């Protein structure tokens, strides 16, 4: 059995699970002021929309069982919907994942189950790194899904991780990334200055022949 996952923010890591261990697509919409707030120690819940497709009929009701399990590892207001198509079953999840510093996320995860987070860090050049990271709950979810069906599971990174960075800051913001695609064009290094209300859509390819199959996608943000 083969399956695909598509996650949109605007969505997840996502973010989440199905017959394939890695999601196909994770779309994340990130506002620059949310990053600024997170740097001050607050947690910001980032909305995620994830869709998973299995290329077979779900005769045993595994998707419904997986949904019940996944609810334990997602925000309480997550919305699940399932539909059937010509190629199999599709499960859509609308949820959120937390954005924050390592310290604030550690505290948050002490009382909240989430399979993925957006980690904010400041490097030695004063650039702000934002990366998608799985948590210990991701491994727990993967294990429980495997108990239902050995073809079920969850892991990161996704085949494609799509960061949509939107500037709502008063001043210009610089966003950059390494080895990415923008408007379907490959870039060894991508950089863009965002005016207020400007945006950049950056895609990380995480397929098996890509470096991002082994490391977590990260974008760099600089507030001049």
PLM regions and their residue ranges:
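Envelope-exposed proteins and targeting segments
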Residues: 26-30, 46, 126, 159-161
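C-terminal motif of bacterial Sec signal peptides marking the signal peptidase cleavage site
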Residues: 17-20
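Mature, soluble, non-transmembrane domains
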Residues: 73-224
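Bacterial signal peptide processing site
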Residues: 22-24
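Post-signal peptide N-terminal segment of mature Sec-exported envelope proteins
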Residues: 29-50
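N-terminal, post-signal-peptide region of Sec/Tat-exported proteins
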Residues: 50-75
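Bacterial N-terminal signal peptides that target proteins for export
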Residues: 1-9
């Amino acid at each position: 059995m083969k399956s695909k996952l598509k996650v949109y923010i605007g969505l997840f890591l996502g973010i989440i699970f199905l017959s394939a261990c890695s999601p196909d697509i994770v779309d994340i919409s990130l506002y620059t002021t949310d990053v600024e707030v997170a740097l001050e120690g607050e947690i910001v819940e980032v909305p995620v929309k994830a869709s998973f497709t299995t290329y077979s009929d779900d005769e045993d009701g595994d998707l419904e069982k997986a949904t019940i399990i996944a609810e334990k590892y997602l925000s309480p207001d997550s919305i699940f919907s399932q539909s059937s198509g010509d190629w199999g079953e599709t499960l859509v999840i609308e949820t959120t994942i937390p954005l924050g510093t390592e310290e604030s996320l550690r505290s948050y995860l002490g009382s909240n189950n989430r399979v993925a987070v957006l980690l904010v860090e400041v490097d030695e050049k004063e650039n702000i790194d934002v990366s998608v990271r799985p948590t210990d709950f991701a491994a727990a979810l993967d294990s429980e899904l495997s108990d239902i069906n050995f073809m079920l599971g969850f892991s990161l990174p996704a085949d494609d991780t799509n960061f949509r960075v939107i500037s709502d800051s008063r001043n210009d913001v610089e966003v950059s990334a390494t080895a990415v695609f923008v408007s379907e064009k490959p870039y060894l290094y991508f950089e863009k200055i965002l005016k207020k209300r400007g945006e950049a859509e950056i895609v990380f390819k995480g397929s098996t022949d890509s470096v991002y199959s082994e490391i977590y996608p990260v974008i760099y943000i600089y507030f001049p």
